[in-house]
């Protein structure tokens, strides 16, 4: 905590710390995969359900992983009960919807999966998902956790182009506005 010179009050500072972990595929260990019990129930949040159900951009299919397929123009996402909580589910769905705005029939972003371009697209999706999460009033903790994987690429790009973050924020804002328009137009 530091004292604010103008008010004299103590203020807390948050300092992000990047940690590394060794991760192994469960098949490379003698452990058994943890599975959520069948009794685990994650209750949907009605305002989030209404919002996402009102968007008519691409198909949303149940799958084992969350991703957007630009080739087939659909979102795959596990059932809400596979997530630790509803906020994580909706933040992930928001992230994939932001990706879907990059399709050629929508905003037409370059969605090449070469590492630098893909890292930029991920930054757009992370920022856009934060915008949607804030709009819906849900916690964006998972978004922050996912962003650490791309942090090194983003910092390198920011060093090379100081406007990198602002450009990504502009693209994320366009994607967010596009989704809001789709949501409003289908109600």
Where are these regions (language model features)?
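N-terminal accessory/interface modules of nucleic-acid-binding and processing proteins
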Residues: 1-187
